[in-house]
């Protein structure tokens, strides 16, 4: 059986790229495809075998301006020739669910998220755009949104990275999905002897992460906040940061995990589809102070969780329910009032339920019937 692994693009490092990397490790004989590829961001195991990219790769600086190439996505995706493959496994938060396969082939899509800027995040993205860009984006979005819905019907079986995403797949595409949480390298996590006096924020510095709320809260409380990550928001965030805020940039794995391990807690303000960063923090036994919506509801056991009874010794964090500095400040103070009651060992054990080995085992089980017999899956199977 010939197999292809298809990822939306390798233009940054994040949870989606980690999933694609694990897929490549699971299936070393599979060929790898992507819409666009920046060699700097291709995982080592994938770069050794090579990636076949779409014709968009020939556009100068395409990996930097890929969002502006939205009108070309449908054509670029459909020009990738996957007819030789019996099983196509896509890792997608973009347009790759629309690849064309043979009628007798099986297409399984591991969906990190429907495209936010086409669906639930459309108006938020539109508001941030210059006036001259709004009309072209609106016209292109209408066309690509229609295509994206049609493309989703080509998939034989969806796997969602969280219950939250499964709900959005159902709402926007009318498709059922199996839920399989993405892989976390929990073995990298370790327990520090004692935390140091700082809070941590980690991730790409982009608008929806709402890092500015964390900065404002820590400015007003006078708490130390260390920020790991780079992105287009960095200049704006630096401009609003007070003396207790420190920007660490991009860290190597060793330094990143050490920074997790010695933080008092992780601060997380985004409404994420899943969110690997909170689990990486918990793999080091550190609590999470998170926005109580989206994927965080599935990865953090909060003491103040609505509709869920969490004992003090089982808690792994605290939620705030409004994306405001005031709500974050209140959550930080609530955490500090009970900080000594958290069990680093219990927090770490909670994170290990999401380990890479668990993901690989379940993924192999999901794919096994189709690998063995090329049986086209039924919806929700």
Description of each model-found segment:
Residues 287-292, 297-301:
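Short hydrophobic beta-strand element within catalytic cores of glycosyltransferases
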């Amino acid at each position: 059986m010939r197999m292809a692994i298809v990822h939306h693009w390798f233009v940054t490092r994040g949870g989606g790229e980690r999933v694609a990397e694990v897929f490549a490790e699971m299936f070393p004989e599979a060929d790898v495809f992507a819409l666009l590829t920046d060699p700097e961001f291709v995982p080592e195991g994938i770069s050794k075998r090579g990636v076949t990219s779409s014709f968009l790769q020939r556009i100068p600086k395409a990996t930097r301006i890929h969002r502006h190439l939205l009108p070309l996505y449908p054509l670029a995706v459909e020009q990738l020739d996957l007819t030789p493959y019996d099983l196509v496994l896509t890792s997608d938060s973009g347009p790759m669910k629309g690849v064309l396969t043979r009628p007798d082939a099986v297409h399984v899509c591991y969906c990190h998220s429907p495209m936010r800027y086409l669906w639930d995040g459309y108006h938020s993205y539109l508001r941030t755009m210059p006036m001259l860009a709004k009309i072209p984006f609106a016209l292109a979005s209408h066309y690509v949104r229609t295509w994206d819905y049609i493309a989703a019907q080509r998939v034989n079986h969806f796997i969602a990275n969280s219950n939250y995403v499964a709900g959005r797949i159902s709402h926007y595409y009318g498709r059922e999905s199996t839920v399989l949480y993405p892989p976390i390298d929990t073995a990298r996590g370790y327990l520090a002897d004692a935390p140091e006096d700082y809070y941590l924020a980690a991730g790409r510095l982009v608008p929806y992460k709402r890092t500015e709320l964390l900065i404002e809260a820590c400015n007003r409380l006078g708490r130390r906040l260390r920020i790991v990550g780079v992105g287009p928001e960095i200049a704006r965030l630096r401009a609003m940061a007070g003396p207790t805020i420190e920007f660490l940039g991009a860290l190597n794995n060793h330094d990143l995990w050490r920074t997790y391990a010695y933080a008092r807690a992780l601060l997380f303000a985004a409404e994420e589809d899943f969110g690997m960063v909170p689990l990486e923090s918990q793999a080091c036994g550190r609590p999470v102070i998170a926005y109580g919506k989206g994927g965080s509801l599935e990865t953090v056991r909060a003491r103040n969780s609505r509709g869920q009874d969490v004992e003090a010794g089982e808690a792994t964090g605290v939620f705030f329910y409004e994306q405001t500095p005031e709500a974050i400040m209140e959550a930080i103070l609530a955490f500090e009032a009970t900080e000594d009651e958290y069990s680093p060992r219990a927090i770490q054990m909670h994170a290990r339920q999401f380990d890479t080995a668990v993901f690989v085992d379940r993924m192999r089980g999901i794919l096994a019937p189709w690998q063995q017999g090329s049986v086209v899956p039924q919806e929700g199977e």
